[in-house]
Amino acid sequence: MYKKLILTVALGIAAVSAYAGGYVTNSNQNVAYLRNPAQNAVIGVQGAYFNPAGIGFMENGWHIALDVQTALQRRYTTSTYEPLKYGIDNEGRGYKKYTGKSFVPALPHLDLAYKHNNWFGSFHFGVISGGGKAKYDQGLGSFEAPVAMIPALINTLAGATAVTAYDADINLTGEQYNFAGQLNFGYRINKNWSVSAGVRMNYLSNYYVGSLKNIRLQPAGGQMMPAAAVLASAISSLTGGTVPADQIAPMASQLVSDKALDAHQKDIAWTPIISVDYKTGKFNFSARYEFNTKVRLDNTTKENSTGISQFDDGKQIAADIPGNLNLGAQYSVKPNFRVALGFNYYFDKQSKQYNNETGLNDKQNYLKHNSFEILGGMEYDVCKLLTLSIGANSNTFGFGNDARFISDMSYSTSSISGGIGAQFHVNSRINIDLGVYKTFFLHFTKEQKDYGANGELIYRKLAPVVSQLPLSPEIAGKLTPENLAITGQDDFYRTSIVAGVGVSFSF
């Protein structure tokens, strides 16, 4: 079976990022993060994103940093669903492993800061969420399962193996980006305190183009045929032949008709940001709060025959960026040795997300608790030309046992990450940064009593047809959501590594 699915992996979840933080956040906004993710209390030009108030403790003048990062990621979803055994290429197995591959060769970031005495300002540009593409050569379970359900249904109703295999052509291309520019202004109150306020402009743009076509079924002892013909024949036999197959054919065609999608979603949203920095002796403490960002994606849809309301033309879709609180501390053990800690808390449950199941902006209610992140790292100045650094962080997501918030199209799992790198001091005003950041994701299994809600889906499609046919009570009794539901599960796992190089100037 030929299936090719190209899908951007980001809703919150971002093919190009190391995916630290909330489900829509790329935290690797400067290469310094790769070599030491504990950047919350940093005093440097990268503070334009991580610690805007800390800019107040830099030297007077201009400070600029540019970097480019390269990301490699793999996503592995193992779907266990009994009807998958009918897949022409699945060799009778009721499970299948889907692998998504993503490679982003160059992802740039810019940081700019200016300080004059007590006054200062900063600017940051980067892809805050989304970006990149993931290629799934074998499709995804959520796309294949509804097709797999068709032979399973026919065989159940027939009480025998009437259909032995299925095939289909599935294509989907998706892209999700949030290009963001962040501007902050601040004032150093005294030698200890500095404050800053700013705003981030987010330009969000999502594209989805795809289709489900040419569903085919293989009758027992026969060859692959159009699904509508096989289905019409099967339904006719269930009526005892009282309704001819050619009379049922139009209804059967609707049940297995081709589906297509061509949609563009976009919005411009604003994130207010406030931060404070307290510096005393060898210690530096920071706090940054980003307010919840109201996002209402406007749909411009050329075609949507999928039945997924999220892509209806003219509809507004809630996709808020969660507010988050970021705390940091840095301690200079010696003049050439520093340690840092950080804590990030994301208010995921308070940010509205569109829910296809209810048609309301309430998907966030599926979350068990908000996500959070713990970070730590250290830096050592080997000599006046070289600084070495290392760090790690862990993040925890509150998906809960049923994990209804995530799917094989959009997910991340709790993880532990580590970064290592170096900064080369060309002179007192020019530095070169190198960093590598590796994430070790945990497996997460999502159990489903009705896998992909396919039982409910098939029931809704069949109900209008069944009501027009003289079926026996025994057969009609099998066509309920409860009887059509088949249990299944998805096991989610990812790998990710990011490397980058950057240069910074002061003048």
Model-derived segments and their meaning:
Residues 1-20:
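Gram-negative bacterial Sec-dependent N-terminal signal peptides
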Residues 16-130, 414, 437:
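N-terminal, post-signal peptide beta-strand-biased segments of exported outer-membrane/organellar beta-barrel
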Residues 21-34, 43, 107, 115-507:
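Outer-membrane beta-barrel porins/channels
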Residues 7-8, 39, 204:
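General helical structural elements
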Residues 4-5, 83, 183:
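Intrinsic disorder/low-complexity segments enriched in polar/small residues
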Residues 11, 55-57, 112, 266, ...:
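A general structural signal for short secondary-structure junctions and capping/turn motifs
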